[in-house]
């Protein structure tokens, strides 16, 4: 997930800083996170929830397409079940790679960072209703709650270039 958030070059910068600071030392996850954050000037405070909270987040997907406005709206909501000693969970910082596949072959690819309980993204100039390819490259270890039609699953299975989502759609 670090490489997904930082990009390949940013991840490399973080690794270089990590080894510069800690080579040969006994370190913690916090040391690794600090090196990634410092090397990329990125606040990863919320990312620590992955280390401090038990359980796997569940992400619910809701989508809406407005043909008249040529606008696609994607709403993601995250929850995590209570666990012993943690009856309530804070939102995780979840990086999700997505791609919108359309009949016109307009492919919008984006990295979404889900940091709140619910967030909505709007995509303009989408010529026809897209098929959503989400959590590409298994960008986050989540449980996905997403009802897709058989037609959409067939489109992903036959046309998606992401091996993880092709497998999941089958």
Residue ranges of model-derived segments:
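Non-catalytic accessory/interaction domains
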Residues: 1-12, 16-170
